[in-house]
UniProtKB/Swiss-Prot annotation:
PANTHER family in alphabetical order: ATP SYNTHASE SUBUNIT A (PTHR11410:SF0)
NCBIfam families: ATP_synt_6_or_A, PRK13419.1
GO MF term set: proton-transporting ATP synthase activity, rotational mechanism
GO annotation, cellular component aspect: plasma membrane; proton-transporting ATP synthase complex
Membrane topology: Multi-pass membrane protein
Species assigned in the record: Pelodictyon phaeoclathratiforme (strain DSM 5477 / BU-1)
Transmembrane segments: 107-127, 172-192, 197-217, 236-256, 269-289, 296-316
Protein name in UniProt: ATP synthase subunit a
CDD domains assigned: ATP-synt_Fo_a_6 (cd00310)
Sequence similarity: Belongs to the ATPase A chain family.
Location of the protein in the cell: Cell inner membrane
Keyword terms of this UniProt record: ATP synthesis, Cell inner membrane, Cell membrane, CF(0), Hydrogen ion transport, Ion transport, Membrane, Signal, Transmembrane, Transmembrane helix, Transport
Predominant location category: membrane
Annotated signal sequence range: 1-32
Length: 340
């Protein structure tokens, strides 16, 4: 397999990493405070400068509060897409149905965008792959996609699930590319991180949970599935083991949910906080020395985290499926070790 030419990709990522902090700085609120001159000796001037100083302190506090509002507006889900300096797009409101608000939000839009991109991307790659002969080596985008697919197939699905991994490969590939693209689009200007919404990560983890339970039922049957809840202990300990094992069934999807949500949210908070330090402190030196360089560093780190979290979510999903569908040979090995 030929090596993928990544020079253009690296250049593109560097440009994005440089532009995002600058765009955020350019569009952020400028908190200008009037510098106070030396205090005159006259009481009348002093009485005027005192309220001015109080106003400066109030403006500084307002700047910090407004910076926090901007950060939370960027992180949380809402029905407004900001395209500064061009304006805003307000998404349509849908009346609640049975008390449930089903209005379209920016994270919902990003989920649709990710789904559309994946459909188009894999349709193009699949059509090119079908046209290739046995002697042709994949190049460009097809080569890159093949490398990622083979990595998930061999090093994730097959390594963690073992025999019968093919049944779960489509799900694992879908989860990997879906989470990866959601993470990456959150780093694009004017984009939003759908995986920074705990409802999205909880839904993905719920899919993994149900697939894991179905895999366990298929591998061991209802009797074996229920027997697993006892942990292979003496019946006298079942009153302790069954609640523990039952709770353990739900700790795995909870861990998947919190891990992805927290990691994708934390990075954006750090980047925006570093950027707004220069506005709050009103210092160009802070902006040049700390805000912009550190923001670029964290941004590049977020690119790595985007791939890493997609891999971790997929790897843990395959690991949970593999543990749930462990074959009898594995159980006999454990029984033999316990016997000896």
């Amino acid at each position: 397999m030929k090596r993928v030419n990544v020079i253009q990709a690296k250049a593109f990522l560097k440009v994005i990493a440089l532009l995002v902090p600058l765009l955020l700085n350019a569009n952020g609120p400028a908190f200008a405070l009037t510098e106070q001159a030396s205090t005159p000796p006259h009481d009348s001037v002093a009485s005027v400068s005192a309220p001015t100083a109080e106003a400066a302190v109030a403006a500084h506090a307002h700047g910090e509060e407004k910076a926090g509002d901007v950060i939370m507006h960027h992180i949380l889900d809402n029905d407004v897409f900001s395209f500064e300096p061009f304006g805003e797009v307000h998404l349509p409101k849908i009346p609640p149905i049975a008390g449930v608000d089903i209005s379209i939000t920016k994270h919902v839009v990003m989920l649709w965008v990710v789904s559309a991109i994946l459909l188009i991307l894999f349709s193009l790659v699949g059509s090119k792959y079908k046209k290739m002969t046995a002697r042709q080596a994949p190049t460009g985008l097809v080569n890159a996609m093949e490398a990622l697919v083979e990595f998930i197939r061999i090093d994730v699905a097959k390594a963690n699930i073992g025999v019968g991994y093919e049944k779960y490969l489509n799900y694992l590939l879908t989860v990997f590319f879906f989470v990866l693209l959601c993470n990456l689009l959150g780093l694009v200007p004017y984009g939003a991180t759908a995986t920074g919404n705990i409802n999205v990560t909880l839904t993905l983890a719920t899919f993994t949970f149900f697939i894991t339970q179905v895999a366990a039922l298929k591998a061991h049957g209802i009797k074996g599935y229920l027997a697993h809840l006892t942990g292979g202990t003496h019946p006298a300990l079942w009153i302790i083991m069954i609640p523990i094992e039952f709770i353990g069934l739900f700790t795995k999807p909870v861990a998947l949910t919190i891990r992805l949500f927290a990691n994708m949210t934390a990075g954006h908070i750090v980047i925006l906080s570093l950027i707004f330090i220069s506005f709050i402190l009103q210092s160009y030196i802070v902006a040049v020395v700390m805000s912009v360089p550190f923001s670029i560093f964290i941004y590049l780190l977020e690119l790595f985290v985007a791939f890493l979290q997609a891999f971790i979510f997929t790897m843990l999903s395959s690991l949970f499926i593999g543990l749930a569908s462990a074959h009898e040979g594995h159980e006999e090995h454990e029984a033999g070790v316990a016997h000896h």
